[in-house]
């Protein structure tokens, strides 16, 4: 296929640039038509930047990838979908807001667009979605990270080592908005934000983000584990997250939200 895939991006940070690098190395030509940022004059890197969603959509992207956080997703996603453009959100945790999720699904259905949920930092998301049709009774996500990966994004003290949080996926997204997007993906693929259990652990000796997914039900059970290296010291995201966003933008390896 020689026609370039036209991709827009919300955000222009470490994650966005890492994903753009993966897209640039694909066999199919990909054109990054622009990044939506608050101040184009301060944007770093070689990607073209725009200061409004109208300017970005004027570049006729076929798909837009959000890499700018939950607030940006809430602000721009509905307009993107209403324009008939598919959306790949990195900030899946924002979809714990039932009203927002409903509004985005309504906009997508009306315009014939899709919300492509990436697999993020975890393997086994497709298996969890398949198991849901058979019957899933319990889902647990357990994340183990170095203190800096969690402390910079929350207010209040955290333990030096051990269990920092235990609760539902909905509670985890509220507590760790920068770190709990994977829990959103797991909740949407499986049994929802309230029934999905989450444990966040701190390990000062950790050199990677360790993600574990455990599920049990009428299908049987499984345990998946990923030890993901971070993109950089300044980013909490694992390198594989950028790859999953690129894969979803290219049209495969994603969960279609419905």
From Swiss-Prot:
Per UniProt, which keywords does this protein have?
A: NAD, NADP, Oxidoreductase, Pyridine nucleotide biosynthesis
Q: Which cysteines are joined by disulfide bonds?
A: none
Tell me which Gene Ontology terms the entry assigns under biological process.
NAD biosynthetic process
Record has Oxidoreductase as a keyword: yes
Miscellaneous comment text of the record: The iminoaspartate product is unstable in aqueous solution and can decompose to oxaloacetate and ammonia.
Q: This chain belongs to which protein, by name? A: L-aspartate dehydrogenase 1
What residues does NAD(+) bind to?
A: 121, 181
InterPro entries the UniProt entry points to: Asp/hSer_DH_NAD-bd (IPR005106), Asp_DH (IPR002811), Asp_DH_prok (IPR020626), L-Asp_DH (IPR011182), NAD(P)-bd_dom_sf (IPR036291)
Catalytic residues, per the record, are: 211
Family in the record:
Belongs to the L-aspartate dehydrogenase family.
Q: What is its EC number?
A: 1.4.1.21
Has the keyword Protease been applied to this entry?
Answer: no
Function according to Swiss-Prot or TrEMBL: Specifically catalyzes the NAD or NADP-dependent dehydrogenation of L-aspartate to iminoaspartate.
Query: What reaction(s) does this enzyme catalyze?
Result: L-aspartate + NADP(+) + H2O = oxaloacetate + NH4(+) + NADPH + H(+); L-aspartate + NAD(+) + H2O = oxaloacetate + NH4(+) + NADH + H(+)
EC top class, as a word: oxidoreductase
Pathway note: Cofactor biosynthesis; NAD(+) biosynthesis; iminoaspartate from L-aspartate (dehydrogenase route): step 1/1
Could you tell me one molecular function GO term of this UniProt entry?
oxidoreductase activity, acting on the CH-NH2 group of donors, NAD or NADP as acceptor
